[in-house]
């Protein structure tokens, strides 16, 4: 038996393994064993004769994380070159030009969806996975990308992917962390954004903490209420200047990530107005229009918003980025 211990640990997964002549596995959670052991057994089919490993799964939240962990060990011990990617929600294991294993999600995939022909990235017709579970944000991106024939998916369609902790200290650090981590896990092109509201008189707050400005269990309503409270003694609208900021990062396997940024200037109103949008939209007065972002139609907002401007910049530089890498 070789002495090397393999370990992978993040906030949602923890695996330990050791190369062995005799195989065994231990799952600390019975439900996890029922869910994930079949994938483990399928991967054991890739072992050379006489090889095996001992696997301990302390906690698990991601099929693809387990697959990557086991394949990394097999590649090192057997000098293989197994690769993993995601396709239409399925996990594919390949070596060279050979497709060796397909792990389907629990509910399966329709034949039509699985074999649907994909467009080339260079045609800007590929599917982009948006690194968010926020349906409001996804809707905005979908409307923008639809004009370019780009289909948008979000993380709600990939329930096995782990949550990526936003531990960065800047918008770019957080966006990079999300895009590059998820691209690495899925093998897909991923677009992540980190957006927030910067209020000048508050020194740029809420900034990267915009989504949780009022606490860990923050809602749009509680965040808006806290913002109004912080500005309660600021009576001149000109002193309530603010900017919505977006940093977009596109990450893809074996490519240097693409980064674009944009700001949308305005002011913080004294009370919420409008029913469209989400987040701080009801409080954000757009420039000198007198309207809040929540009073604009989706079409109007997409043209001038921080995300609209950032996506426009992205589309201008994307072809050169794709061809250069």
UniProtKB/Swiss-Prot annotation:
The keyword Magnesium applies. Residues 1-128 are annotated as: Unknown. CDD domains: HAM1. The active site is at residue 194. Residues 129-324 are annotated as: NTP pyrophosphatase. It catalyses: XTP + H2O = XMP + diphosphate + H(+); dITP + H2O = dIMP + diphosphate + H(+); ITP + H2O = IMP + diphosphate + H(+). GO terms for biological process: nucleotide metabolic process; purine nucleoside triphosphate catabolic process. PANTHER family: INOSINE TRIPHOSPHATE PYROPHOSPHATASE (PTHR11067:SF9), INOSINE TRIPHOSPHATE PYROPHOSPHATASE/HAM1 PROTEIN (PTHR11067). This is dITP/XTP pyrophosphatase. It comes from Streptococcus mutans serotype c (strain ATCC 700610 / UA159). The lineage of its organism: Bacteria, Bacillati, Bacillota, Bacilli, Lactobacillales.
